[in-house]
């Protein structure tokens, strides 16, 4: 009789473990699906070549429209106001909800010495488009910086 009760308890315990496992898998799946909504840039690093257009993509997997701005910055630029040898195209654009768009940069080699030590970053900002009905509040601007590597001159 005691053995029968132990077997029933073991079976009940295993069922509870199974229910806990299924519940935790459901929670993880629910959490993962909510992480897929957002804004993103691809790739995570850009390899620029002299006078060539390098494309990257911006993604909007949300139900909001965003104004996207881009520029190339460097550590030296903030200190010395150095000239940035890049052109961005387009510098600003509207990114509709649940869409993606191609953007790009061009490295302009204007006879300057190629310096691999110089660090450049593509700074992309996502500004939520404000609705006319939104009288109060403020928008949160999301900014992401991506390393721009300079390839050897061709």
Curated annotation (Swiss-Prot):
UniProt superkingdom: Bacteria
Purpose of the protein: Could be required for the biogenesis of a putative fimbria.
Keywords: Chaperone, Fimbrium biogenesis
Entry's family note: Belongs to the periplasmic pilus chaperone family.
Pfam families: PapD_N
GO biological process: cell wall organization
GO cellular component term, pick one: outer membrane-bounded periplasmic space
Phylogenetic classification of the source organism: Bacteria, Pseudomonadati, Pseudomonadota, Gammaproteobacteria, Enterobacterales
The gene coding this protein: fasC
Alphabetical list of Gene3D superfamilies matching this protein: Immunoglobulins
Annotated protein name in UniProt: Protein FasC
Cell membrane recorded as keyword: no
Organism for this UniProt entry: Escherichia coli
